[in-house]
Amino acid sequence: MDAKTDDKGAGKCPFSGGSHGHRNRDWWPDQLDISVLHNNSKKSDPMGAAFNYAEEFKKLDLEAVKKDLHALMTDSQEWWPADFGHYGGLFVRMAWHSAGTYRITDGRGGAGAGQQRFAPLNSWPDNANLDKARRLLWPIKQKYGSKISWADLMVLTGNVALESMGFKTFGFAGGRADVWEPEELYWGPEGTWLGDERYSGERQLAEPLGAVQMGLIYVNPEGPNGNPDPVAAAKDIRETFARMAMDDEETVALIAGGHTFGKTHGAGDPSLIGPAPEGGLLEEQGLGWTSKYGTGFGADAITGGPEVIWTQTPTQWSNHFFENLFGFEWELDKSPAGAKQWKAKGAEATVPDPFDPAKKRVPTMLTTDLSLRFDPIYEKISRRFLENPDQFADAFARAWFKLTHRDMGPRERYLGPEVPKEELIWQDPIPAVNHELVGEADIEALKAKILASGLSVAQLVSTAWASASTFRGSDKRGGANGARIRLAPQKDWEVNQPAELAQVLGKLEAIQGEFNGAQKDGKKVSLADLIVLGGAAAIEKAAKDAGTAVKVPFTPGRMDASAEQTDVESFKVLEPRADGFRNYINTKRHQFMHPEEALVDKAQLLTLTGPELTVLVGGLRVLGANYAHSTHGVLTERPEKLTNDFFVNLLDMGTKWTKANGEVEIYEGRDRKNGELKWTGTRVDLVFGSHSQLRAFAEVYACSDAQEKFVSDFVAAWSKVMNADRFDIVAKKQAA
């Protein structure tokens, strides 16, 4: 049919693709957004359900790809010529900025999915002209097709760039599968590029953010808010790099190592730069930042403000960065673009011009470079690197590997011939299986022992959930494998109820010891497996007691990590501020989300869908998995039985819900007729009746014929969480 026309006569498509009308979020901005649970669904994946990236990568001739990348480094293109005749600096920056969005608070960001191709990252001010880097790579991506993802190719290119400039890298692992749509992440509250509303008090950076301004990877190179104070800048550097899991030595190594190569681009007035890729014209074909200054590229390129070349050999690995940093005094200067930067005082022109061999420049530095000299902690490290170039090279190689692989998870996910053999503490290592695994008869006998131990359904379910639900699909950390729930810091987390946890683990360890001691053939069961098996046994019992027979899938093979394999500080970031699945909020820590938002956030980290989130909350409530045995949301008269009572009673129109007097975020459900108190609940409970989409899911499980479906779906979602970190199983399937 014909589209309606407005008063100006322009046709308007009545469908969403051509309309600029209001969406639900525009009308109701405070509406809980659960769309993140269905981000990057299979429907947006053009590769199809049968595609296995790991299998494709194994077919890749990595040496051939690297040979092509080496050739590209010096194959300068007219449309975007290489500085100094070598693209190395550009590609190092591309790989760095692909990985550098990683943040430890929630494990999101990073190089693992090739998100630099999509908005907003492809249009961040800090990523200006990296679109050109990816276009330079396109012929190589096109040549090798599905055998190498964009995510892997960007990191590999950074490695090859370093190697082509004489640096020995620590290694490379493939295995990063591409996604096909932007990740819906919270990057900050600002509505303008380079805004910094994320600070409060004494420059306290809001969590979970890891950068100082909207659209930057880390810090402002001119200094905090453009203030050229190296000492103040050091504070920003330390905070932002720490939020990317880097310590002081790694930070110094990364900054100095990265700035050994290439240059920054501030040749002229930045107001002459066109819009970023996402705001560009159709005919620009996804390229952005088209400049009207001179030719717009080469010697006239503008990427940001500063125009800095750090070393005398910007296409070769050297120790010139530190030699220059400490060898000169520095005076404040301005770039041709008007940005604050520093030049070596009274220095000879020893630095090459990127395009005119007859010209030389004096060494220049950024405010954030000088932080490595004027911050006392950074200075000590920097002087050691100055005097010991071999230590600097090793530190940079290791820090670069960590930067580009931090969000890949355990070593089982690493692919390719260049995977380093050394096991690193930040990889959260777990021992390889070194014994025969339990069989079906053993599993049934162990379940019977667990159920006869005196531990309740609630205790077993809570412990298994506490162990497995630390998993983060973002950076593939956490999970039940390793049984780190018995180690610091997890054993002491408030949410895990340490005293009761110790009691449960003590009984499970006794069962483990008795079983392992009785075996004659080397067969063993790990505590990690036993914790998960205890949850399975409890769920089977709870379902049976509710009149529904079910078998919870269980695959042995988890192992127990040691304290020596566990970085306590690194694991502290996995402690939940809130866990809506257990109706828990840590009142001692700042909450930057409403409880129901935190629930959705955790569900997304667990890779759950909306229906899976719904069925898990309903099941965990009736099983008694609440923190501190709270009765909030336990909407059943039959606790520890796996019934659909939570949904039935929540949606009962005979109950009227009101806020409890004097109780923060607690609600009372009273009989509509006589006012008698029936239930209490939290925001996390009531959202399943309030939010229209979650209510629709809840209605499915509240129906009179839904009990079997509820149990089946709960077991499936439960098993998904219990096995979320079983990359060993995936690796075995791929090897078979």
Curated annotation (Swiss-Prot):
The gene is katG. Its cofactor is heme b. The active site is at H97 (proton acceptor). Residues 1-10 have a biased composition (Basic and acidic residues). Gene3D superfamilies: 1.10.520.10, Peroxidase, domain 2 (1.10.420.10). GO terms for biological process: cellular response to hydrogen peroxide; hydrogen peroxide catabolic process. There is a cross-link at Y218-M244 (Tryptophyl-tyrosyl-methioninium (Tyr-Met) (with W-96)). Keywords: Heme, Hydrogen peroxide, Iron, Metal-binding, Oxidoreductase, Peroxidase. Signal peptide: none annotated. GO terms for molecular function: catalase activity; heme binding; metal ion binding. Belongs to the peroxidase family. Peroxidase/catalase subfamily. It comes from Rhodopseudomonas palustris (strain ATCC BAA-98 / CGA009). The keyword Oxidoreductase applies. CDD domains: catalase_peroxidase_1, catalase_peroxidase_2. This is Catalase-peroxidase. The record marks R93 as: Transition state stabilizer. It is an enzyme of class 1 (oxidoreductase). Coiled coil: none annotated. There is a cross-link at W96-Y218 (Tryptophyl-tyrosyl-methioninium (Trp-Tyr) (with M-244)). Residues 1-26 are annotated as: Disordered. Formation of the three residue Trp-Tyr-Met cross-link is important for the catalase, but not the peroxidase activity of the enzyme.
